[in-house]
Amino acid sequence: MRQVWFSWIVGLFLCFFNVSSAAQYEPPATWENVDYKRTIDVSNAYISETIEITIKNIASEPATEYFTAFESGIFSKVSFFSAYFTNEATFLNSQLLANSTTAPGDDGESEIRYGIIQFPNAISPQEEVSLVIKSFYNTVGIPYPEHVGMSEEQHLLWETNRLPLSAYDTKKASFTLIGSSSFEEYHPPNDESLLGKANGNSFEFGPWEDIPRFSSNETLAIVYSHNAPLNQVVNLRRDIWLSHWASTIQFEEYYELTNKAAKLSKGFSRLELMKQIQTQNMRQTHFVTVLDMLLPEGATDHYFTDLVGLVSTSHAERDHFFIRPRFPIFGGWNYNFTVGWTNKLSDFLHVSSGSDEKFVASIPILNGPPDTVYDNVELSVFLPEGAEIFDIDSPVPFTNVSIETQKSYFDLNKGHVKLTFSYRNLISQVANGQVLIKYDYPKSSFFKKPLSIACYIFTALMGVFVLKTLNMNVTN
């Protein structure tokens, strides 16, 4: 099931993610949105948005680019976005731009940012095409109210634009919220045509007609039920060590985790917590008692530590590593911890065809708990001493990459080759994304380390032997 989901993510991340210099910019009015259906899913610790849209080229010349608009506040939280034709499974080239437009908003002028979608073939004048645009954001609603009791249900307040935010005029539009059992508008407008209505587990708006471009002056504030933790990893340091001699790959992850859920309205009570656990009957709560770490299959030698020391409240079951922190993590609480495990190297390393000295390492970008967002991720892969990297490929855009050496046990020369990727705004959906590292590891380097160690040991033993043969006695 994960592989099926990952195939979708791979296509999504293969899009370009370039950023150009910021400038005041306004896309040409080449298109008209014939039908604009927007859906926002609030069921997770992050927001996902799907726009099903039919567009028409109203210019006099063929067009190959379509611009999608973002509010500046949400633009900085984009984890990734993609687009594809409705009737095809081929993803289109997509990229985020730094170009911006100043448009009127609720509080004066607001800044509009852009993503660009490029078509493989030009769209002729008066021709229509249907697209699906997907965006995921490393953000979620804020707790409303900010403080709740341990047994009370949590609600979140989310603000977004009510009408389509687009660089083009829209003929017909609708908007649907999904992912919660209850929705309620906060300060609903007087205009009844803008009001939403509940429909089962969704909240629907529209349809609206003839909406001008950049209609962002109608803000929607929605309160919805979300009785689950909001796991946010502020910093994740992920170290992965490859050993050709031991045929193992070792993982170690250091988490700085916080729960963005509602804070306790009263002080913490262990007695009340035990009562809550006994009476909740497996009902989901807004605090964390157990973290389910999703690990690669075949993982062994698990361990779980925190700043105090080894934590024994954990157990592994197949590819799941269940860890129980020393204390429940309520809203606003933090917990720093380290987990580690070992896998067979053959599950992650492949020999290139044509040479037994060229290797391809396939490293998962993330492991860890589901439904989690990551602000900063540092992924370091330690290759054997003497390895030479000649190509890397990451399905997720990284902010920085560096190559250096770092000495470890029995490193007598330069040390392990350390390849470090830095990422921002990741979500748990990319857990199966693979970083590919192609490198050379010649036989001479493979045997150099044990031979060097053997030479040092031999030299030491010979030194001891020579010292023993010397007559160190003092005589007259």
Curated annotation (Swiss-Prot):
Coiled coil: none annotated. Keywords: Endoplasmic reticulum, Glycoprotein, Membrane, Signal, Transmembrane, Transmembrane helix. It is found in: Endoplasmic reticulum membrane. GO terms for biological process: dolichol-linked oligosaccharide biosynthetic process; protein N-linked glycosylation; protein N-linked glycosylation via asparagine. Disulfide bonds: none annotated. Residues 471-476 are cytoplasmic. InterPro entries: Ribophorin_I (IPR007676). The chain crosses the membrane at residues 450-470. Residues 23-449 are lumenal. It is a single-pass type I membrane protein. Pathway: Protein modification; protein glycosylation. One of its GO terms (molecular function) is structural molecule activity. Component of the oligosaccharyltransferase (OST) complex, which appears to exist in two assemblies comprising OST1, OST2, OST4, OST5, STT3, SWP1, WPB1, and either OST3 or OST6. OST assembly occurs through the formation of 3 subcomplexes. Subcomplex 1 contains OST1 and OST5, subcomplex 2 contains STT3, OST3, and OST4, and subcomplex 3 contains OST2, WBP1, and SWP1. Interacts with SEC61, SBH1 and SSS1. Belongs to the OST1 family. Present with 11900 molecules/cell in log phase SD medium. Subunit of the oligosaccharyl transferase (OST) complex that catalyzes the initial transfer of a defined glycan (Glc(3)Man(9)GlcNAc(2) in eukaryotes) from the lipid carrier dolichol-pyrophosphate to an asparagine residue within an Asn-X-Ser/Thr consensus motif in nascent polypeptide chains, the first step in protein N-glycosylation. N-glycosylation occurs cotranslationally and the complex associates with the Sec61 complex at the channel-forming translocon complex that mediates protein translocation across the endoplasmic reticulum (ER). All subunits are required for a maximal enzyme activity. This is Dolichyl-diphosphooligosaccharide--protein glycosyltransferase subunit 1. It comes from Saccharomyces cerevisiae (strain ATCC 204508 / S288c).
